């Protein structure tokens, strides 16, 4: 299996005794700050979180996932060695859409923010897997609580856990507790050649 195809599988448990290392951390930071975006504008801020206490507080606010027994559980993907939070951001020079009303402007900027976050997080995902790490995306969190923990009023677009897998467990086993996440079937992307 190639690193690319392997990188589409999420990790839910982590080996916290290992350290990502400064070189890989810097590579992830470079990807986050240099990924392409519309008009090369900064549509997001990133929070690079290694503070275990803060990561666990965020984890406590990620309820929204149901395990195989139908019990709501926190999302263990955020318990990785490094947690990245993507915060919506608008710099003054983003406001070049001056001919739009507020609703049109908000729709365009939100689209561009999400596209930029998708590209940047994709870069991180691939870099992580190329360096022996795994990743886990999270979008099921209590927004107001996570914003308060990160001390921001801006929307948190997505969370991305990056770290070493716990090789003593299956990737769908919980990091904390003894439950198993419901595995999802692989996606099938239709490709049209012309």
Spans of model-derived segments:
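N-terminal amphipathic, basic helical "cap/leader" segment at the start of enzyme domains
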Residues: 1-93, 192-194
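C-terminal helix-cap and adjacent tail motif
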Residues: 2-21, 157-194
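Small-aliphatic-rich amphipathic alpha-helix that forms the alpha element of a beta-alpha
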Residues: 32-33, 84, 104-147
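Short secondary-structure junction motifs
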Residues: 41-44, 130-134, 157
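Short, charged, surface-exposed secondary-structure boundary motifs
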Residues: 78-79, 95, 168-173
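Short secondary-structure boundary segments
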Residues: 88, 140, 162-164
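Short, flexible, mixed-charge acidic loops at enzyme active sites
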Residues: 93-102
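Short low-complexity, flexible loop/linker segments enriched in glycine and/or proline
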Residues: 151-157
């Amino acid at each position: 299996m190639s690193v690319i195809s392997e990188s589409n599988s999420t990790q839910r448990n982590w080996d916290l005794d290992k350290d990502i290392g400064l070189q890989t951390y810097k590579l992830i930071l470079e990807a986050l700050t240099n990924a392409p975006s519309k008009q090369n504008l900064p549509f997001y801020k990133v929070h690079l979180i290694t503070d275990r206490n803060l990561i666990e507080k965020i984890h406590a606010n990620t309820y929204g996932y149901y395990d195989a027994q139908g019990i709501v559980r926190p999302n263990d993907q955020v318990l990785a060695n490094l947690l990245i939070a993507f915060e919506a951001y608008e710099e003054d020079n983003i406001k070049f859409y001056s001919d739009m009303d507020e609703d049109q402007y908000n729709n365009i900027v939100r689209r561009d923010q999400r596209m930029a976050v998708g590209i940047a997080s994709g870069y991180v995902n691939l870099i992580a897997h190329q360096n022996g790490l795994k990743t886990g995306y999270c979008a099921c969190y209590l927004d107001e609580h996570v914003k308060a923990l990160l001390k921001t009023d801006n929307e948190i677009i997505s969370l991305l856990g990056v770290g070493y897998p716990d090789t003593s467990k299956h990737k769908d086993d919980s990091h904390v507790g003894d439950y198993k996440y419901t595995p999802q079937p692989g996606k099938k992307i239709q490709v049209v050649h012309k």
